[in-house]
Amino acid sequence: IRVPDFVPKEIPSSVRRVLADIEVTSNEGGPAIEPHWGEPGLTLAEKVFGWCNLEVLAFECGNPKAPVNAIPPRAWARMQLRFVVGVDTDALLPALRRHLDRHGFAHVRIGPSRDDMFIATRMDPDHPYVQFAVDSLTRTYGAKPAILPNLGGSLPNDIFTEVLGLTTIWVPHSYPACSQHAPNEHVPVTIVEEGIRLMAGLYWDIGEGLPKV
């Protein structure tokens, strides 16, 4: 990403530390992960969960239904920025405008889409509630859970953290091959049973008392 306003200034050390234990792999039977994808110099986990990514959702040039052997007069693209905490969303379009103008593309028009935007949120992995949840799940499951400071997708978590001022910890119950948002989306019964045990243990420990913050 060439526009500085499109990325955070850095990845916090606490985030880097927990992401060092995360291994991002492709699903069985799925496409291989492109080794050159994402920001150079970052690990694959840091690229997904600690940095921003600019995607081309759709692109059209000329008339696809009636292509001709000529340079088309116009092109159109729908872009999407997957961003993390530390990016000022109000500064995105002005920064892109300056970037295009500086490189001789003042004639290119830009504008926001009509889609809603989720504000990025992140729980500090060093927060006492995070360690409380990790300890509880470890006791119940018998192994330490993976810790993600935030997800790589879109969630309306800002409603809880920014509007209501709450501390949030998500405990998902799924697995990589669940085909989420795709045909045959599913979850094995064993994972549901495991999730019930984990949450029962977590709520039991919460009832025993939370750490003071």
Walk through the language-model features, giving the residues of each.
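An extended, acidic, His-containing surface patch that forms the Zn2+-binding/catalytic region
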Residues: 1-66, 70-74, 82-95, 103, ...
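Active-site helix-to-loop segments that bind/position phosphate- or nucleotide-bearing substrates
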Residues: 79
